[in-house]
Amino acid sequence: MKALLALEDGFILEGQSINGHCESSGEVIFNTGMTGYQEILTDPSYYGQMVCMTWPLIGNYGINKEDMESEKIHVSALIVKECCRNPSNWRSETSLPKFLQEYNIAGIEGIDTRALTRHIRINGAMRGIISTSITDPNDLILRVKKVPSMEGQNYVTKVAPNSPWVLYGQCVVPADIKEDGSFLWKQNKIPLIVYDYGIKWNIIRLLEGAGFDPLMVPPLFSLEQVKASGAKAIFLSNGPGDPGTLIDEIQIIRELMEYYPIAGICLGHQLLGHAVGGTTRKLTFGHHGSNHPIKNLATGHIEISSQNHGFCVNFESNNDIEVTHINLNDNTLEGFIHKTKPILAVQHHPEASPGPMDSQYFFTRFKEVVLLKLGC
């Protein structure tokens, strides 16, 4: 079935719908990963975005339950050159087209993804729309101009939980919070409050592997509630949207900084940046992929990282902050620590899923910071 992709600047591409009649809109971005499409589709950080995969064949190893990063697909649409309908892999349980259809997510193939990627790289990420029903490009362009811009959008409210929860295997289970606000933590584990702005499940697994007992909570979980829970440390997750819109969340982080060790990844990194006096700005086309080189300034080592963000943190002048990592493609900030408080954060994704594992030491480093704060 014929489908059109229109960008807000009038750029039009024609392709075929992967799963029948569809219409979807959002911010069009590109991802340079060769694999990992299931993890990308189910990453809540992609909420409100239409993802163009630069690798020409997507879906050849299918879909399985174990590679989910959340309970469902969060992207607005998937854009590929060719979608494989007959996957071949011993772990495959269903195909990519069926997976998209199950969650009613638009998909388009037959697109010149190289031309689209070049256009975005030169002109920046922009609003787009896919439709099988509207065949007049001019009508599509008029409609896409009504789509909200990513800047100024609080999409955390679309993906964050309303109440505390824990992860058992692949199941999200409501947490048993007592009437006094306390929680029964696991023995011999560090009690950890995780602010869930749209967390990926592999972050939780690696926190558990590092010796933490993570309890996921809503974005506006107060300092008083944290104290009542008995937690010893705070973790700020990834998530979608514009970090500058999360005023209340940033204020809560400022309060938490006075009492607890804190680590943040991706959106968590950006919110911590705001909390300690920095700002954020939108990147031209963002960093999305599993092959981004960064430099660890403490060791001098180069790490290949998994990334997914459209905003970056800036510190004009802050003597309390030490930059720990930079992006070697554009020299943007990739990580920082606070010189006097137990705070550390990275913009990239040390949990990978998908991507390389060069930066997974971040979780054990956070544990070391927490134990030092606790006097252990």
From Swiss-Prot:
Which residues bind L-glutamine per the record?
45, 239, 241, 267, 270, 308, 310-311
The UniProt record lists the EC number as 6.3.5.5
GO MF, one term, reads: ATP binding
Pathway the protein acts in: Amino-acid biosynthesis; L-arginine biosynthesis; carbamoyl phosphate from bicarbonate: step 1/1; Pyrimidine metabolism; UMP biosynthesis via de novo pathway; (S)-dihydroorotate from bicarbonate: step 1/3
Among its keywords, does the record have Amino-acid biosynthesis?
yes
Where are the annotated segments for CPSase?
1-187
The SS bond pairs are none
> What reaction gets catalysed by this protein?
hydrogencarbonate + L-glutamine + 2 ATP + H2O = carbamoyl phosphate + L-glutamate + 2 ADP + phosphate + 2 H(+)
EC top class named in words: ligase
* UniProt record, GO biological process: 'de novo' pyrimidine nucleobase biosynthetic process; 'de novo' UMP biosynthetic process; glutamine metabolic process; L-arginine biosynthetic process
Q: Which residues form the Glutamine amidotransferase type-1 domain?
A: 189-376
Q: Which CDD domains match?
A: GATase1_CPSase
Q: Which UniProt keywords apply?
A: Amino-acid biosynthesis, Arginine biosynthesis, ATP-binding, Glutamine amidotransferase, Ligase, Nucleotide-binding, Pyrimidine biosynthesis
**Active site, per annotation:** 266, 349, 351
Q: How does it assemble?
A: Composed of two chains; the small (or glutamine) chain promotes the hydrolysis of glutamine to ammonia, which is used by the large (or ammonia) chain to synthesize carbamoyl phosphate. Tetramer of heterodimers (alpha,beta)4.
Summarizing the function annotation, the protein's role is:
Small subunit of the glutamine-dependent carbamoyl phosphate synthetase (CPSase). CPSase catalyzes the formation of carbamoyl phosphate from the ammonia moiety of glutamine, carbonate, and phosphate donated by ATP, constituting the first step of 2 biosynthetic pathways, one leading to arginine and/or urea and the other to pyrimidine nucleotides. The small subunit (glutamine amidotransferase) binds and cleaves glutamine to supply the large subunit with the substrate ammonia.
User: Into which family does the record put it?
Assistant: Belongs to the CarA family.
Q: What is this protein called?
A: Carbamoyl phosphate synthase small chain
Which organism does this record belong to? Lawsonia intracellularis (strain PHE/MN1-00)
**Encoding gene per record:** carA
